[in-house]
Amino acid sequence: MAYKCNRLRVLGAKIETTAGTAEAITASEATVPVFNLTYTENTTYTRRENVSGGKLKGRRGPLIAQMSFDVEAMGLGSSGDPAWATTFLPPCGFVGSTGVYTYTRVYANQKTLTLKSFIDGQYRLIHGAAGAVRLTYNAGGISYFNFTFTGIA
């Protein structure tokens, strides 16, 4: 059995210009190292019963997927916003300017992401993704932002 290297990965991410439309991701958008990247598909299958005895094929439900990962809580060491903050915080409901991000429950022009990664040799992409973030503090250690994004597979 092959060893799963899931500790440190690079995830490509780009904010979409039109919500729900996948963006082309290049190497310049895949510069943020992430930890503990997981991908889960939540696709359902509906089995259909036919009263007259015929055969009706079942239907696949919506192609929904979720990506979760951790990012170290760190800045640039100079003025400006780090790449992970400008990319991952707006789709979680945060509006930022000059290094200050404020959570807004509902706002017009909600940002969405296209996320792309290779996991165990398989290409994974979700688009139209929005999510949630949680900050985990470790006393005397490294703090992490835990992101979870749900989108279209």
Residue locations for each model-derived region?
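Signature of extracytoplasmic/envelope-associated structural regions
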Residues: 1-153
